[in-house]
């Protein structure tokens, strides 16, 4: 998780050849990312770390693919805005960025991931000043600093 540069097309292919299903890969990716975000946020806030449960909840996975699934633009199957079916109707209504497309193979994980991300991130697409919010630097400067930090940490998507 700390080194996204190690996730290559060859590595992804080796996971699939080893028996990890494409939708399982997306679920693992989503859960790992959500847990990392929660851990880093609680650490940054100085709060107590959240403990993971000792066992997973019992249940059966849906194992159903949304309409319009195709490989690309990366290595795993996704659904493009043009091919999105009813389960993704309102997902692409605010523009299309490839990171938003990355988990579309498993809509439940997509929604779980973005419920968290939407609460942690500033809204897209414009970098507007927030009316009535006083601070020392502008929102554009905040976004610039975030971009530089992301580049420094090799956090690219």
PLM regions and their residue ranges:
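Hydrophobic alpha-helical segments
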Residues: 1-157
